């Protein structure tokens, strides 16, 4: 039964990822006053399927000097970790109800760094290695603020479980009392998923393609899938943390529709940002985090810790 549930979670996610690539190309196309893909199928709707067929039927080329095992393990690990992070997400019921689901997701996203590092190191290419080192530094740095923001949200909800956040936000979204946190969280998720304007790992002008420069065909497709799975997952997590919907146990499908709509809108915002903003310089990226976000998130975390203690002294208003 668990395997059936797992497949019923993973299959729609992979399908959503496939069509997210099409949505991205269409949105970027219309923003640049062109049509985007229109050849394969009606309105280009079958483009993701043809892309998948093309990538997986190509010969998986491998550099002679690369470390074979690690070279092939890295993309597999990247996708496996990206899909594992969907397990504790309540939609409205999670696949397994963990008490420490937020910690689990944080741990999984930290492990994703290894896949990137292995791919850059095993490729035995300078471009790939520089791209991987950048990605690792960026991901580890932004995880610091993500963890502190999560801690602040946990202080507001009072539990490490994601399901509790649905009850916490029954009457009011957490984005309203903690909007600075939500803004910093959204920008940090952009950096965490290596999206524009933080896509320094894939700086085409300087690194050709970043850590996946030596990959082609199937392994490249796995990296691609992992990246877009992480994007949707991060937006789903943002929805649960800050835009939680009321879940009526009699009509759970209403929650699911609400949840997916918000996730879709946030993903559209990701694509819109990509079309609008130029890439940051590397020192600006690090400066933004260590000099701006970190002090702010720490101060806000202390504030949310102190707030219940301060208000506990106020006599009840009758």
UniProtKB/Swiss-Prot annotation:
Key word Transmembrane present: yes
Membrane topology: Multi-pass membrane protein
Alphabetical GO biological process terms: aerobic respiration
InterPro entries attached to this UniProt entry: NADH_UbQ_OxRdtase_su1/FPO, NADH_UbQ_OxRdtase_su1_CS
Residues annotated as transmembrane: 2-22, 70-90, 102-122, 147-167, 171-191, 222-242, 253-273, 294-314
Enzyme Commission numbers on file: 7.1.1.2
Residue stretches in coiled coil: none
GO CC, one annotated term: mitochondrial inner membrane
Enzyme class, spelled out: translocase
Molecular function, one GO term: NADH dehydrogenase (ubiquinone) activity
Compartments reported by the entry: Mitochondrion inner membrane
Any Pfam family matching the protein: NADHdh
Keyword set includes Secreted: no
Catalytic reaction annotation: a ubiquinone + NADH + 5 H(+)(in) = a ubiquinol + NAD(+) + 4 H(+)(out)
Record keywords, A-Z: Electron transport, Membrane, Mitochondrion, Mitochondrion inner membrane, NAD, Respiratory chain, Translocase, Transmembrane, Transmembrane helix, Transport, Ubiquinone
Similarity comment text for this entry: Belongs to the complex I subunit 1 family.
UniProt cross-references to PANTHER family, sorted A to Z: NADH DEHYDROGENASE SUBUNIT 1 (PTHR11432), NADH-UBIQUINONE OXIDOREDUCTASE CHAIN 1 (PTHR11432:SF3)
Function (record text): Core subunit of the mitochondrial membrane respiratory chain NADH dehydrogenase (Complex I) that is believed to belong to the minimal assembly required for catalysis. Complex I functions in the transfer of electrons from NADH to the respiratory chain. The immediate electron acceptor for the enzyme is believed to be ubiquinone.
Protein name from the UniProt record: NADH-ubiquinone oxidoreductase chain 1
Lineage: Eukaryota, Metazoa, Chordata, Craniata, Vertebrata
Gene behind the chain: MT-ND1
């Amino acid at each position: 039964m668990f395997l059936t549930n797992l497949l019923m979670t993973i299959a729609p996610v992979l399908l959503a990822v496939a069509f997210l690539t099409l949505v991205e190309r269409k949105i970027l196309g219309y923003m640049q006053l062109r049509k985007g893909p229109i050849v394969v199928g009606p309105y280009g709707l079958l483009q993701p399927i043809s892309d998948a067929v093309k990538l997986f039927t190509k010969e998986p080329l491998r550099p002679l000097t690369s470390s074979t095992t690690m070279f092939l393990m890295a993309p597999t690990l990247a996708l496996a970790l990206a899909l594992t992070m969907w397990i504790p997400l309540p939609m409205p019921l999670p696949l397994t109800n963990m008490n420490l689901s937020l910690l689990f997701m944080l741990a999984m996203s930290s492990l994703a760094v290894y896949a990137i590092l292995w791919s850059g190191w095993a490729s035995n290419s300078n471009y790939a290695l520089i791209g991987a080192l950048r990605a690792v530094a960026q991901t580890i740095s932004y995880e610091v603020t993500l963890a502190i923001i999560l801690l602040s949200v946990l202080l507001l909800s009072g539990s490490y479980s994601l399901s509790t956040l649905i009850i916490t936000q029954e009457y009011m979204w957490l984005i309203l009392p903690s909007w600075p946190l939500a803004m910093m969280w959204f920008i940090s998720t952009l950096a965490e998923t290596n999206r524009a304007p933080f896509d320094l790992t894939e700086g085409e002008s300087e690194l050709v393609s970043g850590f996946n420069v030596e990959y082609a065909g199937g392994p490249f497709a796995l990296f691609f899938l992992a990246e877009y799975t992480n994007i949707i997952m991060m937006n789903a997590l943002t929805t649960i943390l800050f835009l939680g919907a009321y879940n009526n146990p009699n009509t759970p499908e209403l929650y699911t529709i609400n949840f997916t709509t918000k996730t879709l809108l946030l993903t559209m915002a990701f694509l819109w940002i990509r079309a609008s903003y130029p890439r940051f310089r590397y020192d600006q990226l690090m400066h933004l985090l260590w000099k701006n976000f970190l002090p702010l998130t720490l101060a806000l975390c202390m504030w949310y810790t102190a707030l219940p203690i301060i208000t506990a002294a106020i006599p009840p208003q009758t």
